[in-house]
Amino acid sequence: MPKLKTRKAAAKRFRPTGSGKKIIRRKAFKNHLLEHKSSEQKHRRLSNLALVHEADEKNVRLMLPYM
């Protein structure tokens, strides 16, 4: 059976947790247009990593076959 290809865009955006059972992602809305956003929103709400929702996890795992 041939090797499976990894979707490189997904590989840059997602990584597994320490146990490997769940997938971590970065939160959105923190790239540009930050002047009008409050520092609370930027620092407290958007700085932490988030888990990929279980409904989307299957699709992410299909894009990353060796994760």
Swiss-Prot record:
In alphabetical order, the GO MF annotations are: structural constituent of ribosome
Query: What does the UniProt keyword field contain?
Result: Ribonucleoprotein, Ribosomal protein
Provide the Gene Ontology terms for cellular component.
cytosolic large ribosomal subunit
Q: Where is the signal peptide?
A: none
What Gene3D superfamilies does the record tag this protein with?
A: 4.10.410.60
* Keyword match Ribonucleoprotein: yes
GO terms under biological process: translation
Check the record and name the Pfam families matching this protein.
Ribosomal_L35p
The cross-references to InterPro entries, in alphabetical order and at most eight, read:
Ribosomal_bL35, Ribosomal_bL35-like, Ribosomal_bL35_CS, Ribosomal_bL35_sf
Asked whether the keyword Ribosomal protein is assigned, the reply is yes
Family membership, please give it.
Belongs to the bacterial ribosomal protein bL35 family.
Entry-linked HAMAP family: Ribosomal_bL35 (MF_00514)
Name the PANTHER family on file. Answer: 54S RIBOSOMAL PROTEIN BL35M, LARGE RIBOSOMAL SUBUNIT PROTEIN BL35M
The protein's name is: Large ribosomal subunit protein bL35
The species this protein was found in: Synechocystis sp. (strain ATCC 27184 / PCC 6803 / Kazusa)
Q: What is the lineage of its organism?
A: Bacteria, Bacillati, Cyanobacteriota, Cyanophyceae, Synechococcales
Give the encoding gene's name: rpmI
